[in-house]
């Protein structure tokens, strides 16, 4: 579980084509999280190649690549980050696409409410941590199973 007193901060990648939103997000959350921003889906992909993130938050309406298209494009290579979608438009088709194609965890409307967004980030991180714990446990079980199968084969051969 994440310890807020530890040195590690939750790492958030925030993607928005409006520079003022990037500045505002970073100013609001930089004390609580390690915030990296990107002004486009293309730049966000570059950031993902440089470092890993717990959470990705993206605006939906951006030129060249929508938030859903961005999330869908990174799904295979970067499956672990929890995805949140922000949009100022009540576009139900975008939300449906985000859930089905972009595998979003949560949808929020703009302008965002600081408390609501902060809670969404915290909840998303708890989900990320739980998934990582499950992966580790599954790996341990696989290793134990492999060892038991090996011992059983050895016993059957003797």
Each model region followed by its residue ranges:
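Conserved phosphotransfer cores of two-component systems
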Residues: 49-51, 73-80, 101-102
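Conserved acidic segment of CheY-like receiver
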Residues: 7-20, 24-29, 56-57
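Alpha4 helix (beta4-alpha4-beta5 surface) of REC/receiver domains from two-component response regulators
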Residues: 69, 90-107
């Amino acid at each position: 579980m994440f310890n807020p007193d530890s040195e590690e901060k939750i790492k958030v990648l925030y993607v928005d084509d409006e520079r003022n939103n990037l500045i505002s997000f970073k100013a609001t959350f930089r004390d609580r999280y390690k915030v990296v921003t990107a002004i486009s889906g293309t730049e966000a992909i570059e950031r993902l190649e440089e470092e890993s993130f717990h959470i990705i938050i993206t605006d939906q309406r951006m030129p060249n690549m929508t938030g859903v298209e961005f999330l869908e494009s990174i799904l295979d290579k970067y499956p672990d980050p929890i995805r949140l979608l922000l949009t100022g438009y009540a576009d139900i088709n975008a939300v449906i696409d985000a859930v089905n194609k972009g595998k979003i965890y949560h949808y929020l409307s703009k302008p965002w409410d600081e408390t609501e967004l902060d809670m969404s980030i915290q909840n998303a991180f708890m989900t990320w941590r739980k998934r990582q714990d499950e992966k580790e446990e599954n790996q341990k079980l696989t290793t134990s199973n492999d060892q038991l199968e090996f011992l059983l084969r050895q016993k059957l051969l003797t």
